[in-house]
């Protein structure tokens, strides 16, 4: 069901039993020769435009930092993980029930499953994708078939009117402002869709009539133009909104520029550029009727570009378009990291650059050089504020990173490190002795869910950390280490209730359960949530085992490293040449956070329900990097965490001074489920306030203090949690109260240190030992 088309509260799928934890998902889960560098007029004669099927990878001409410096210190330079061999044989090989899309090579590269364009790969290929600021989809409407494009204004958003603040807002979808087709296309059955060069920030779509007759659409996040390149086909542009007027503004030796006014009063600019960059004066376009624009004749290689804004400076980018984005990064010092989106571009423009739009968190992180490339153009995004236009072939950014974040308890936002009195250590020891001696991690984790088993294992891993590094109790540590390693062995040998498989179709580690089990893990939902708990457990076991055995005898790590890194490669593969897993399956570098939805089509695009478990996924990678001595891995995780802090505080977690989200919505304090096209202040498992808020807090670790500021916690507590805390009598209460350690550690510690503490207040992934150790460290 596509909720975004109706101006009524979108229903939230129920999870059975009113469980206070995340339960089984609804059905279905989460419904729903080389390219030329873009040349400038002052450069030599431009090269011929590339033909489809050739590599999209060429260096960008715009590179404000020295390439030699970036490449030599590039934290993304392969190899990051030293062993990219086939997944362990314990994983059975299976074919995925979701067929692979029509791609140019059916056997070589792993396919992305959680990226902005995945919607278009599924079912009948008609679900929208969001490159931001545009939405794009394939229309099979018999009257208006082809590739449709649209941009929505903030004024078009639909807000819930039944609650204050509104529970949701969404943008209307499937408004066919423009539909690209060719005069030779008689019906949608004539069109063959082909998907090429599918990377984690870009892909290329072909609408083909034959091998020589096709329209090519490079789709790159943040692209300023919707670009179509016509190969031996006649240009035709249609609109369901309707064309009110078509005006030729100018025709020069490089391009033709036209103003198109739609019947909804929106004005768009159309640029037409010939492949030899010498625009023929006899080439004309005209209105055939109020829904159709056609050309006088065809030009093989005609570049057609639509812009939703009309500021004159956009002319400087006309004829140039991005086709691929390369990611690079460099550690500046212990506090900051630079990172760059380096766009490979094709075509020719007056400025030598293309047009790109940046989200607010990009703009906030831009280096001073980026200010010179900013133009007076801004377009609304769907759910992430106002985007700003730049004439550029790269985004150059710098963010603060949590270099000091490691295993030990810290409160980064309070600038506090652990300090325990003897009284507190005694209280922590009392809890630890009870939880270790009465525990059975092997039995507790013997369940049919990688998510819930991971939470349980990580709970005991943090107890293990406390017994060894805070209590310094070797006997207690050895007792729990033995239990925990036995529990982990079930998963490492793949003997759990629902074993994992290796999917040879899309290429990844998936559950053997059905699409409705374990939150849709078998369809690539939530992998970063699920597997990160296991990675954290492995990191802590490795750390403690190494300490007990001696630095030179870290046998547990070496014996199990391939299995752990297989999970990391699945949800956050860091090497672009890994033949078994896609790069960064879950994490979206343009949006600055992960997407939880996998191979399920959705009318509102990808979504994310838990910012805190997203943080946990990168925290897990950092901890594994620390324990294995992999500095590149820790640097990448630090960068992700640095980006996430800005992103979550802008788009997901709302302090009263938030200026990015609509002012009428920030009173919710948290997003709930954030989709690409809407925000719904809800969860997939219930509507209780503690569910909606604390799914963005769980699990509380040192990493929580990096993202959740004391002021945010204060506002959320006073406005949302304090009024209901006395009515919460289950595991969510413990999460709420440990979350308070980020604001008032003493208040939190006093709650957990009560002599008659009720353990029913602990979530199944939360221990009293860790709750006392974390809150007591700073009180």
From Swiss-Prot:
Region called Disordered, residue ranges: 1-71
Residues of the GH81 domain: 73-779
Reported effect, residue 518 to A: Abolishes enzyme activity
Name the UniProt record assigns to this protein: Glucan endo-1,3-beta-D-glucosidase 2
Note in the entry: Present with 1420 molecules/cell in log phase SD medium.
Localization: Cytoplasm
Region (May provide specificity for triple-helical beta-glucan): 678-680
Family matches, as PROSITE patterns: GH81
Reported impact of residue 588 to A: Abolishes enzyme activity
Assigned keywords, A-Z: Carbohydrate metabolism, Cell wall biogenesis/degradation, Cytoplasm, Glycosidase, Hydrolase, Polysaccharide degradation
Protein's gene: ACF2
Impact noted for substituting residue 613 to A: Abolishes enzyme activity
